[in-house]
Amino acid sequence: MTNFKTSIVRLVAALFAAALCALAGSVNLGAQNDVRTAKPSGAAFETSIRTHESRADPQGGHQVPPANEITTGIETASWTAPTRTSVMTMWNSVSGANGYLLDVSCSSSFDNFVGGYHDMDVGNVSGRVVTALRVGATYYYRVRPYTTTGPGSYSQTMQATTNPTTGLIINATFDSSITADPNATAIEAMINRCVSIYESLFSDPITIEILFRYATTAPDGHPLRPGATARSDNGVYHIPWSTYIGALRADAKTSNDNSANASLPARALATIVRASSAAGRAVRLNTPPGMFANGSAGNGGPYDGIVTLNSSAPFQFTRPVNANNFDAQRETEHEIDEVMGLGSDASVSYFHPQDLFSWSSAGVRNITSNGTRYFSINGGLTNIVNFNQSADGDLGDWLSEACPQTHPYVQNASDCSGQPFDVA
């Protein structure tokens, strides 16, 4: 495992080393907006809300249909491994059942219940991902089918244990747009796979809170932009340059961290650094979650960010992915990256941690959308990946090839259908 912090050293570096994308339709990852909000009570820094949208490229052969044209079929979900704070509960379907009532307990005798999981109506599905659990704990679960005449008998008692390792925790919360969807089990399992991948990569003992949605609207209810396939919203803290750089230097733990720190500028390139709430905590700054489910920010907001998949886009939640479908797992990972802290506006006026490692050649920085710009942690000597410089895509993402892509990285500025991949 690695240290989450300077990736924006390793986060940045790990992400492009893991490919993802494919042929047919392509997705351009669009402009990001930075909307200022009030400073949360108890927080040391002013905040804003940052929005990122992924958009379908009409040249790629796929158009996102109107909101009322949802064509995704019911997918069969497979079991996914536990994360540090979640398990996937699964059961056999009962013929004629209208739905199932789920119990989850810390005790095999069910003399106590995990909050909310006592006769929880999970709908007519065959599984549910249970989140916000304790690390390394065993949980017991059972279900009862129900019909119009009432509930049936309990299933056998089953059990699952959360991952006992320490490190990064991503607490996933599922919006009702997911839990009420016929594909809820497949969607939740896909998100759980994403979380498991990230937790296996990063050892920093911090917790990131993300709300996941599957809808045709943004968190505040307005329609997603035409052609949008996915969106992320997250809180951004405006941290004085010296404060952020000092925290970054102090948090060095690996040789990559040391190389990256050695390449930091001797003089400030901007007055403030805009770091996501998760990225700020990764370097031990006071940047708590502060986003509410409606996309607003303020005191007591429980989320670091919100990830929305467009429910009218041709997504597939299981693999292998059909050539005509976009891989939901790849798209979800991209938006998780944004919540964790990746992103750039290629401007010193909106300076982000990623911009600290943006170069045009050895010893020559470039934080503009002109010319060549690439990621390097050794002063530009090694070009790890080129940044996108096209206004049609997100300036914080990787330069992308035409579909089919030879290097289909998760963080590419355009996505292609039919070829899944993951961060690694």
Predicted feature descriptions by range:
Residues 12-24:
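Bacterial N-terminal signal peptides
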Residues 1-9:
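N-terminal secretory signal peptides that target proteins for export/translocation
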Residues 80-88, 122-127, 314-315:
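Ser/Thr- and Asn-enriched, surface-exposed coil loops between beta-strands
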Residues 40-45, 49-53, 57-96, 135, ...:
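Pro/Thr/Ser/Gly-rich low-complexity, intrinsically disordered linker/stalk tracts
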Residues 101-136, 148-149:
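Recognizes extended acidic, P/S/T-rich segments that occur
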Residues 164-331, 338-424:
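Extracellular zinc-dependent metalloprotease catalytic-domain scaffold
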